[in-house]
A protein has these predicted regions:
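Short alpha-helical segment of the dimerization/phosphotransfer core of two-component systems
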Residues: 1-6
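Conserved micro-motifs of the catalytic ATP-binding
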Residues: 21-28, 65-68
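A conserved beta-strand-to-alpha-helix junction within the catalytic ATP-binding
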Residues: 28-44
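Short conserved segments within the C-terminal catalytic ATPase subdomain
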Residues: 46-57
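Short helix-loop "hinge" at the ATP-lid/N-box region of the Bergerat-fold HATPase_c
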Residues: 84-85
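Short conserved segment of the HATPase_c
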Residues: 116-128
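Conserved glycine-rich
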Residues: 157-158
Length: 185
C-alpha cells in the first residue's frame, strides 16, 4: 500500500544519508557467516510467502572475518537477497554464496528470476533507477537498494559486478579484501 511504500522510501533515503557519515573508526571485526545468517533470517518469512527457496552455500570453512560495519554489510546482503525474491517466481531460488581466495572473500547472490536486460545494467546502481518499470509495476521498491549496495561495498574496499540473462536470472558478485591479519594466516 502507499503508506508502506512511503515508509520504505524514507527508510532508504535515511540509509543513503548515513552512508555519507560513515568513518573508518566505526569499523569492527565480524564474520560474513553471522551477517549472512542475519540477512537470511530477516527474509525467511517473505521467501515462504513467495514460494522461493532461499539458501546459503558456504565454502569458506566457516569463520570469514572482515573488518567493517556489520550492520551495513547485513544491509548489502539483505537488499540483494530481497531483490532476488521480489524479481523471482514461485518455485525459484535465491542463493547466497561465500567463498575465499588467498587475499579476498567472494560473496555472490544469484537468483533464478526474470533477469535484467543488458541495456539496463549500466544504470542499475544509480539512485532511484528501476529497471523497465512497465515490466515490474506490481513490484514494490524505491530504486535506492542497489545504490546502497554499491556504496556499502565500496566502503568495505570491495568491488561488485553483475551478470544477468533475461528469463534466467541475475548474479551479483562481490569481492572483499581480507584484513591483513586474516590474509597472513
Amino acid at each position: 500500500d502507499e503508506a508502506h511504500n512511503l515508509l520504505r522510501l524514507i527508510d532508504d533515503i535515511m540509509q543513503l544519508s548515513k552512508l555519507d557519515e560513515l568513518t573508518h573508526d566505526m569499523m569492527e571485526k565480524f564474520t560474513l557467516q553471522d551477517v549472512a545468517q542475519s540477512a537470511l533470517a530477516r527474509l525467511k518469512d517473505k521467501a515462504g510467502r513467495l514460494q522461493v527457496s532461499l539458501q546459503l552455500v558456504d565454502s569458506t570453512g566457516g569463520d570469514s572475518k572482515l573488518l567493517g560495519i556489520s550492520s551495513l554489510m547485513e544491509e548489502i546482503f539483505f537488499n540483494l537477497l530481497d531483490n532476488g525474491l521480489k524479481y523471482n517466481h514461485p518455485g525459484g531460488e535465491v542463493t547466497l554464496r561465500l567463498s575465499e581466495g588467498e587475499n579476498k572473500y567472494t560473496v555472490s547472490v544469484a537468483d533464478t528470476g526474470m533477469g535484467i536486460p543488458g541495456s539496463e545494467l549500466p544504470h542499475i546502481f544509480e539512485r532511484f533507477y528501476r529497471v523497465d518499470r512497465s515490466r515490474h509495476k506490481a513490484i514494490e521498491g524505491t530504486g535506492l537498494g542497489l545504490s546502497i549496495v554499491k556504496h556499502g561495498v565500496g566502503f568495505h574496499g570491495g568491488s561488485i559486478r553483475v551478470v544477468s540473462t533475461v528469463g534466467q536470472g541475475t548474479e551479483f558478485i562481490m569481492k572483499f579484501p581480507k584484513p591483513k591479519y586474516e590474509a597472513e594466516k
